[in-house]
Amino acid sequence: MNDLSNYRKSYEKSELLETNIPEDPINLFNRWFHEVEDFGGSGEVNAMTVSTIGLDGFPKSRVVLLKKFSEEGFIFYTNYNSEKGKAIEANPNVCLSFFWQEAERQVIIKGIAQKTSEIISDNYFDSRPDGSKLGAIVSHQSEVIPSRTFLEENLKKLEAEFEGKPIPRPENWGGYLVTPLQVEFWQGRPNRLHDRIRYTSQSDFSWTIERLSS
């Protein structure tokens, strides 16, 4: 067994105080997102973990890329027939989490996922490189396949079929908008006394703000 008990570090880069936060979590997320960009580092700042409850009753998490956020919520794109797509269809309650190690920050978002409009999905699909478009068509995500060669051969066929032609978005591929119900911001602090601020959505579209113990 590998003993990792000595793996630890002190978090000392910043703080999260009630006197310096907005009333709306999206505004704070926007601030943090761009501050993390300024920190630099090798990771993708828009990489997030999407957690769903599968048809087997077990939670499952995977990393996907956030493609847009606004007051309405958070948008990502995927194959609707994938394991995550089927899970969301059965149970739209999802959790998004961001861990920005270079800034010693984490954001956890609980919300409801629903498909974006076809126009939004079409517009994003049209912005993708042709190789990514064809990849979305050729890959029946989460299905068992005989080999990687199977995918590569099917991709070559599609490349020949669509050479010089527009590539349409497949109906089973598109976006999800996650409407946030609760957003927690975590800032690492010394001695494990981390700052945790939680926003919870109210029926009048306002947010309650609470500090949580670390």
From Swiss-Prot:
UniProt KW keywords = Flavoprotein, FMN, Oxidoreductase, Pyridoxine biosynthesis
Q: Which cofactor does it need?
A: FMN
Enzyme type, top EC level? oxidoreductase
Q: Which GO terms describe its biological process?
A: pyridoxine biosynthetic process
Where do the annotations place FMN binding? 62-67, 77-78, 84, 106, 141-142, 186, 196
Task: Give the superkingdom in one word.
Answer: Bacteria
**Gene3D superfamilies tied to this protein:** Electron Transport, Fmn-binding Protein, Chain A (2.30.110.10)
Q: Which residues form the signal peptide?
A: none
Q: Does the keyword Ligase apply?
A: no
Per the entry, what this protein does is: Catalyzes the oxidation of either pyridoxine 5'-phosphate (PNP) or pyridoxamine 5'-phosphate (PMP) into pyridoxal 5'-phosphate (PLP).
Q: How does it assemble?
A: Homodimer.
Listed name of the protein: Pyridoxine/pyridoxamine 5'-phosphate oxidase
Q: List the gene name.
A: pdxH
